[in-house]
Amino acid sequence: MAKHLFTSESVSEGHPDKIADQISDAVLDAILEQDPKARVACETYVKTGMVLVGGEVTTNAWVDIEEITRRTIREIGYVHSDMGFDANSCAVLSAIGKQSPDINQGVDRENPLEQGAGDQGLMFGYATNETSVLMPAPITYAHRLVERQAEVRKNGALPWLRPDAKSQVTFQYDDGKIVGIDAVVLSTQHSEDINQKDLHEAVMEEIIKPVLPAEWITAHTKYFINPTGRFVIGGPMGDCGLTGRKIIVDTYGGMARHGGGAFSGKDPSKVDRSAAYAARYVAKNIVAAGLADRCEIQVSYAIGVAEPTSIMVEAFGTEKIPADQLTLLVREFFDLRPYGLIKMLDLLHPIYRETAAYGHFGREHFPWEKTDKAALLRDAAGLK
């Protein structure tokens, strides 16, 4: 492969779409805490002064949608009308119904192993050995930049920062290996009382330099810090936000394919979410086992049917064993039926709010990031 550039972006927890994702997942967590078998599809819309929470929920649990919404917004940091959005005064509207019985009859079964997929669809999982967390470097460092922005905002190091921010990192590759960082973009909302010179200096010293590895920075690395020159109006006052609009940010930053389904607000019976997590788990274990340097998994389902309609393994020529053997190992060691993958990854717990900002993958404490099958795969493949 010749020299090339690759770019990924991320957004902070205060970005309007991420506010919506976090509210949807906070509602999901609150329901799962009381009723692990609940069916939840929660969608959120945010705009200046208002939040609309809707969707389909079938559960015996009762949760306070308004309180969950306000608490989530408060934790993100929108606590004053000067920011254009205030957790304490915004209107919160709820429009939640029940899951269609037509869908429900195809999902719930007497034998849990026969639990059908909650919808048709295709999902992808990916892993690469170019970082220690087996994720692509561009999305990994894009996430870390906006995560650092939130950290120095919340700990008071840069008190003039506001919750909305975006990052973008362009990496240089030569023959598939990282050789440097070509460009960094960091746009952050700020208060009126900070001048651009001080902002640029503080962002460089407190956010960018502590995050990006020095060995990848060169004299030619370009920096674009608040390139419009001003970012006071942000959050839901600047743009409306919707659940599920940041699916590339949520996954691999464009370096792997995407089946199109969003994650946030969906309980694990929705394979859009749970099977994408399982596909990441499979791909990561294959790479961790040393069976490939890069691996992409595709899995697909039919609504109401337990067995996947297809499983595909792509290693981009980096596989250490024949490709068809990789597929056989996946089928042998991973149960990708809806009930099987929920059990395999222990997904019926309130763990989802935390996934809704800074990426669903590459964060080691999530169960789909375990590499507990790597040794088994390596032994079965006959590698020393």
UniProtKB/Swiss-Prot annotation:
Residues 99-109 are annotated as: Flexible loop. SUPFAM superfamilies: S-adenosylmethionine synthetase. It is an enzyme of class 2 (transferase). Pathway: Amino-acid biosynthesis; S-adenosyl-L-methionine biosynthesis; S-adenosyl-L-methionine from L-methionine: step 1/1. Keywords: ATP-binding, Cytoplasm, Magnesium, Metal-binding, Nucleotide-binding, One-carbon metabolism, Potassium, Transferase. L-methionine binds at residues 56, 99, 239, 270. ATP binds at residues 15, 164-166, 230-231, 239, 245-246, 262, 266. Its EC number is 2.5.1.6. Homotetramer; dimer of dimers. Belongs to the AdoMet synthase family. It is found in: Cytoplasm. It catalyses: L-methionine + ATP + H2O = S-adenosyl-L-methionine + phosphate + diphosphate. Mg(2+) binds at residue 17. Binds 2 divalent ions per subunit. Binds 1 potassium ion per subunit. This is S-adenosylmethionine synthase. It comes from the Bacteria. Catalyzes the formation of S-adenosylmethionine (AdoMet) from methionine and ATP. The overall synthetic reaction is composed of two sequential steps, AdoMet formation and the subsequent tripolyphosphate hydrolysis which occurs prior to release of AdoMet from the enzyme. Signal peptide: none annotated. GO terms for molecular function: ATP binding; magnesium ion binding; methionine adenosyltransferase activity. One of its GO terms (biological process) is S-adenosylmethionine biosynthetic process. K(+) binds at residue 43. Its cofactor is Mg(2+); K(+).
